[in-house]
Amino acid sequence: MAASGELVPCSVYFCGSIRGGREDQALYSRIVSRLRRYGKVLTEHVADAELEPRGEEAAGGDQFIHERDLAWLRQADVVVAEVTQPSLGVGYELGRAVALGKPILCLFRPQSGRVLSAMIRGAADGSRFQVWDYAEEEVETMLHRYFEAYLPQGTASSSNPSACLNPTVLEKI
């Protein structure tokens, strides 16, 4: 248990495209690097420059990857997704995160020329599910803004899906 005033790190599930395209890999690396300031990033491999567009070659195949990633998603306190590069996997992860009641931040770059799916933008409720437009040079600032608002002091263990998030500010962002 953390002492009063001590920040307890989050378990963060980061979503980014793998098989849908690796064009944003360098950006994912910046995001994961920043997310490490706020807690343990369970899905650091998404940012790995060595990860091929066809995905990782796990010993148990696709089923193993699915089960492992769902276990990480259940463990996570918060989900952060870069949703500019369309990805069926990221959409699936977000749907599962919603079903699990996880707080979600989706980041989208309108300057990409893409249009974000209505199923993502339309899910935003300004509270548990947030979609923020940003420019690439703002990514660290956006993450800082989100976690500064959501991370309370002296929170409990990550067995609670919202343990590292401050519920008193959910409506204020």
Swiss-Prot record:
Subcellular location: Cytoplasm; Nucleus
Recorded superkingdom: Eukaryota
UniProt source species: Mus musculus (Mouse)
Self-association and partners: Monomer and homodimer.
Protein name per Swiss-Prot or TrEMBL: 5-hydroxymethyl-dUMP N-hydrolase
Keyword vocabulary terms for this entry: Acetylation, Cytoplasm, Glycosidase, Hydrolase, Nucleotide metabolism, Nucleus, Phosphoprotein
Location of N-acetylalanine modifications: 2
Binding site for 5-hydroxymethyl-dUMP: 16, 18-20, 87, 89, 93, 117
Enzyme class: hydrolase
Gene Ontology BP terms: allantoin metabolic process; amide catabolic process; deoxyribonucleoside monophosphate catabolic process; dGMP catabolic process; epithelial cell differentiation; nucleoside salvage; positive regulation of cell growth
Stated family: Belongs to the 2'-deoxynucleoside 5'-phosphate N-hydrolase 1 family.
Keyword Phosphoprotein attributed: yes
Primary localisation category: cytoplasm
Modified residues (Phosphoserine): 17, 87, 112, 117, 127, 158
Gene Ontology CC entries for this record: cytoplasm; nucleus
Gene3D superfamilies, sorted: 3.40.50.450
Function (record text): Part of a nucleotide salvage pathway that eliminates epigenetically modified 5-hydroxymethyl-dCMP (hmdCMP) in a two-step process entailing deamination to cytotoxic 5-hydroxymethyl-dUMP (hmdUMP), followed by its hydrolysis into 5-hydroxymethyluracil (hmU) and 2-deoxy-D-ribose 5-phosphate (deoxyribosephosphate). Catalyzes the second step in that pathway, the hydrolysis of the N-glycosidic bond in hmdUMP, degrading this cytotoxic nucleotide to avoid its genomic integration.
SUPFAM superfamilies: N-(deoxy)ribosyltransferase-like (SSF52309)
Catalytic activity: 5-hydroxymethyl-dUMP + H2O = 5-hydroxymethyluracil + 2-deoxy-D-ribose 5-phosphate
Gene Ontology MF annotations: 5-hydroxymethyl-dUMP N-hydrolase activity; protein homodimerization activity
EC numbers: 3.2.2.-
Gene field: Dnph1
